[in-house]
């Protein structure tokens, strides 16, 4: 995990630059890190962006105490998993990492709302789309079975066209990362989840 060290050290300094004690943690890979409008989009919920480039779900577990553990969040939203699959991990392995991350959250923060954003479709990783879909189905089923304050945010379906192929306007020209229009969509979908599930965290 040493290759993440520079990014992790950068995130360790974020807390000192915030004018508030964060209540909503966004944690995960570059899809979180590159969400440039995140603080503006969800500012009333006192967010902190703890995304780091190339992060896997396994890395999110590894660095959880070091990064998320320095805060006292009232809710956590996670996006990770596609890099695990891109590295050759099997869907079942990714689901195990998800369970481990849930355990980290529960052990440290109790039964706070924890949401997992589905792995997005991408043109670059279309060759592993079956694994992406299967991983999403495994994690969605896991969340449904556990219930409670565990939630699944489905962005996958909204990012595909009628044929099931990724909609290009939601992706950068590299076919992998999210475009500004894509983040507008994420703001809408994630915002709907927040409004219906954890709206009481809005700053008074």
Go through each PLM region and give its residues.
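Conserved SGNH/GDSL esterase-like catalytic core that processes O-acyl groups on lipids
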Residues: 2-100, 123-133
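Short secondary-structure boundary/capping segments
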Residues: 16-17, 38-40, 106, 167-168, ...
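Glycine-rich phosphate-binding loop signature in dinucleotide/nucleotide-binding domains
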Residues: 19, 70-71, 109, 146, ...
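Conserved beta-strand termini and adjacent loop/short-helix elements that scaffold enzyme active sites
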Residues: 50, 117, 153-156
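Alpha/beta-hydrolase-fold catalytic nucleophile elbow
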Residues: 79, 117-118
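Charged, glycine-enriched surface loops/patches
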Residues: 95-117, 134-150
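Catalytic His-Asp segment of secreted/periplasmic serine-dependent ester chemistry enzymes
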Residues: 124-204
């Amino acid at each position: 995990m040493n290759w993440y060290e520079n990014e992790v050290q950068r995130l360790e300094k974020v807390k000192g630059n915030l004018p508030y004690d964060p209540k909503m943690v966004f944690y995960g890979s570059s899809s979180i890190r590159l969400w440039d409008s995140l603080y503006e989009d969800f500012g009333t919920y006192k967010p902190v962006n703890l995304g780091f480039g190339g992060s896997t779900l396994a890395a999110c577990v590894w660095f959880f105490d070091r990064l998320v553990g320095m805060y006292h969040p009232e809710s956590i939203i996670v996006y990770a998993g596609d890099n695990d699959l891109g590295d050759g991990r099997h869907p079942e392995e990714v689901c195990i990492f998800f369970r481990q991350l849930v355990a980290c959250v529960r052990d440290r923060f109790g039964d706070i709302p924890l949401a997992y954003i589905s792995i997005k479709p991408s043109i670059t990783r279309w060759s592993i789309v079956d694994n992406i879909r299967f991983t999403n189905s495994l994690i969605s089923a896991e969340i449904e079975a556990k219930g409670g304050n565990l939630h699944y945010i489905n962005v996958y379906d909204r990012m595909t066209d009628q044929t099931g192929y990724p909609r290009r306007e939601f992706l950068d020209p590299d076919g992998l990362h999210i475009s500004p229009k894509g983040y507008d969509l994420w703001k809408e979908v994630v915002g709907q989840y927040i409004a219906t599930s954890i709206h009481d965290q809005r700053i008074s």
